[in-house]
Structures are given as C-alpha cells and as structure tokens.
From Swiss-Prot:
Acts on ADP-mannose and ADP-glucose as well as ADP-ribose. Prevents glycogen biosynthesis. The reaction catalyzed by this enzyme is a limiting step of the gluconeogenic process. Its cofactor is Mg(2+). Binds 3 Mg(2+) ions per subunit. Homodimer. GO terms for molecular function: ADP-ribose diphosphatase activity; ADP-sugar diphosphatase activity; magnesium ion binding; protein homodimerization activity; pyrophosphatase activity. The active site is at E162 (proton acceptor). The keyword Hydrolase applies. Residues 55-193 form the Nudix hydrolase domain. Mg(2+) 1 binds at A96, E116. Disulfide bonds: none annotated. Its EC number is 3.6.1.13. Mg(2+) 3 binds at E112, E116, E164. This is ADP-ribose pyrophosphatase.
Length: 209
C-alpha cells in the first residue's frame, strides 16, 4: 500500500491491479471495459470488478470575465443530452473544447474563445480541474478564467462543420450568479466556474488592475 502524498485518502494507484482493458466501441467517443481488482479497506484484495467506462478525452473550460465592467460572457447552444431532464435543451455555458494531443488547456481555451464567442483573451489564470462523473467516465475538465473586453462580445458563432450554432450573451457577474442560484444555469462546469468567480472576483480584479 502506497498512500498518495498530501491527499486525505487511504490508497493509491499501486493498490489497483488492472487485469485487462478492452475497447467495446470506438467512434466519436469510445467505450472501454475495465477488468480490475483493488485493495479493500480491510486490507484484502477485492474479487475481479468489471466496469464500462465512457472515454471522451479531457476538456478545457474558459470563464470569460471583464474585470473592468464586472461582466461575464456566456454562450448558448443546444445540448440534446439535456432534453429529457431540463426545461429546455438550450443551455447557458462557459466557452469550452476538448483537448487534443499536444495542446495545453490554455491553447484550447484561447482557440475556443475565438471560435465560440469571437473573443480575444488577454491574461489567463488557472482555476481548478475536476472529474466530470468518475463513476462512468474518465473525463477531466480544467477551468481557466480569461480576461476579456466584454464590449467586443456579440453575435452568433460556431463552426459549421461541427454543426455549432452558438449565441453570445454578456451579463453582469451578479446576474450570472443569480441564474446559478435559481437553477437556470445548471451544467457542472458553468456552476463551478461562476461559484469560483463569486468567491474570488475582488481578488481577481485587484490582480488584474
């Protein structure tokens, strides 16, 4: 047993035995079957466990923030996965994109800001990263906040070859956070990013002054 340094958990990667990993489906996304054993809290090793894991890569998320005007830029687009559980499948979100091999989080954030919102990002600051739903997918999302001039944000954007149809919204920081509290913004990356901004906006303004 090798406990991870500085983490308040019991076990580490050395306490997992990967028996096999098989790709069941590969398309735009992939589905992998993991067969593994892991150490139990009683010190024994488990029986073989089988889990199907959705593999879609990792995402970069950008919170576009104008520290002078105290405004954020949100994008609106259809998300068909929200159809069954939300009042509408059109969601208000952060700028985001999948990280390709050789790209950094900042590379993707700056590229997607142009593609999805027509925004040029000035300074950036890492916020945090999180596992989207570790019970079923390996995806990790990394959030950055980016300094923008919100007066330049407007219009309809997106790549036609990716069937994107994206509308830009510029709202006050207070309004965006109110929508979080009211459940009108209910996707994880946007909720986390806007909650972080609500806690740190003054320090960020001082840093970027």
């Amino acid at each position: 047993m090798l406990k991870p340094d500085n983490l308040p958990v019991t076990f580490g990667k050395n306490d997992v035995e990967i028996i096999a990993r098989e790709t069941l489906y590969r398309g735009f996304f992939s589905l992998d079957l993991y067969r593994f054993r892991h150490r139990l809290f009683n010190g024994q090793m488990s029986h073989e466990v089988r889990r199907e894991i959705f593999e879609r890569g990792h995402a970069a998320v950008l919170l576009p923030f104008d520290p002078v005007r105290d405004e954020v830029v949100l994008i609106e687009q259809i998300r068909i996965a929200a159809y069954d559980t939300s009042e509408t499948p059109w969601l208000l979100e952060m700028v985001a994109g999948m990280i390709e091999e050789g790209e950094s989080v900042e590379d993707v954030a700056r590229r997607e800001a142009i593609e999805e919102a027509g925004l040029i990002v000035k300074r950036t600051k890492p916020v945090l990263s999180f596992l989207a739903s570790p019970g079923g997918t390996s995806e990790r999302s990394s959030i950055m906040v980016g300094e923008v001039d919100a007066t330049t944000a407007s219009g309809i954007h997106g790549l036609a070859d990716e069937n994107e149809d994206i509308r830009v919204h510029v709202v006050s920081r207070e309004q965006a956070y109110q929508w979080v509290e009211e459940g009108k913004i209910d996707n994880a990356a946007s909720v986390i990013a806007l909650q972080w901004l609500q806690l740190h906006h003054q320090a960020l303004k001082n840093e970027w002054a």
